[in-house]
Amino acid sequence: MSTTMREMLEAGVHFGHQTRFWNPKMAPFIFGHRNKIHIINLEKSLPMFQDAMKYAKQLTANRGTILMVGTKRQAREIVAAEARRAGVPFVDTRWLGGMLTNFKTVKTSIKRLKDMKAQQEAGLDSLSKKEQLTFTREIEKLEKDIGGIQDMTALPDAIFVIDVGFHKIAVAEAKKLGIPLIGVVDSNHSPEGIDYVIPGNDDSSKAVTLYARGIADAIIEGRNSATGDVVKAIAEGSDEFVEVEEGASA
């Protein structure tokens, strides 16, 4: 769960957007500019990313769930792969309005998807060809829209977002519900309201991989830590048992 300055440089984390598109609220995290492109200060980004990973690890160690969000073309496959590796829910195609604020309705759709999957496994021979086609189209749409959150039984305890501007609806919903946000913020967006800001390039696939892999590693370490604590507690608890001789009276 460690990232170095060199890794960030190689991933292009320091490359911001064109200076004319900058958000002044990102000024504390900008080192300067080169060829009209803002350069993000990695001496700020590195410790802030480490703080975000530490938080993700602690939250997961305490049985918390993190929802990973990345629906931009260059982030989709990376976010989905890392979320699956870490065993957490994710949104990689598009954010449906109300995914958090109207989670009760979303849960109904999740149940529908699971029921359809069970029906599909049992066989669709009883349906006509037209009905099978309609069925297939519906299940494909549900899988595309909510497949990544189908095992999410309750609201997440935190959300990790790549590009807070692109996912402003997700950010707004999380803020409204008081769900902590870990967000990658480029030079053209505001870090306000983001609990754990990661100042950096949100367009480069290499940078996106670095962020997603780091958070996924932290989640895995946190879960392993929690499992280790349980095993340790059971082992230590075994010392408390006192053997009672057979036939001993109360």
UniProtKB/Swiss-Prot annotation:
GO biological processes: translation
Keyword entries, A-Z: Ribonucleoprotein, Ribosomal protein
SUPFAM superfamilies, per the entry: Ribosomal protein S2
GO cellular component terms given for this protein: cytosolic small ribosomal subunit
Gene Ontology MF terms in the entry: structural constituent of ribosome
Pfam families attached to this UniProt entry: Ribosomal_S2
Family from the record: Belongs to the universal ribosomal protein uS2 family.
Name of this protein: Small ribosomal subunit protein uS2
Organism field: Variovorax paradoxus (strain S110)
Gene this protein is translated from: rpsB
